[in-house]
């Protein structure tokens, strides 16, 4: 980040393994072997930070068992709720999608990085009243501290 930009952390969250309720192969505390044997939905993006998740999955051997890929998270709950595919998503997405889509989620059996969400603004807007108001609103609505 250049010296011209300021930032503030809003929240951090873990990634979780999300799947449809009553998935025949998924259970809390699943083994790495079980996790590797299920078919995975991959969110195929080169944008940071999710590219680090795909790298972690590839190291664990998941790419070879990727049955389907999508370019964005928006379709993920619809796909996972009607298939036996498993996907790695940010925990807040899993939490909001679980009830309406009849999904379940659990901690994945492989180590994944934590996702940090920040807001950024250019220094020329640091004293702008509208920008300050918007930043304050974002912090009020989304910050975990």
Which residues fall in each region the model found?
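Hydrophobic hinge/microswitch elements
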Residues: 46-104
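Alpha-helical segments flanking ligand/cofactor-binding loops in enzyme cores
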Residues: 8, 33, 77-78
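Active-site-adjacent beta-strand anchor residues
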Residues: 18, 42-43, 69, 87, ...
């Amino acid at each position: 980040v250049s010296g011209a930009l300021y930032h503030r952390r809003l929240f951090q969250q873990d990634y979780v393994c999300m799947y449809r309720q009553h998935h025949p192969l998924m259970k809390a505390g699943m083994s790495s072997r079980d996790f590797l044997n299920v078919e995975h939905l991959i969110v195929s993006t080169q944008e940071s930070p999710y590219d680090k998740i795909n790298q972690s999955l590839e190291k664990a051997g998941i790419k070879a068992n990727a049955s389907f890929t999508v370019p964005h998270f928006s379709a993920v709950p619809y796909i996972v709720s009607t298939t036996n595919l498993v996907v790695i998503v940010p925990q807040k997405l899993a939490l909001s999608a679980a009830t309406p889509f009849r999904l379940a989620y659990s901690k994945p059996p492989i180590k994944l990085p934590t996702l940090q969400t920040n807001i950024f603004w250019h220094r020329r807007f640091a004293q702008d009243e509208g920008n300050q108001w918007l930043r304050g609103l974002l912090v009020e609505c989304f910050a975990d501290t």
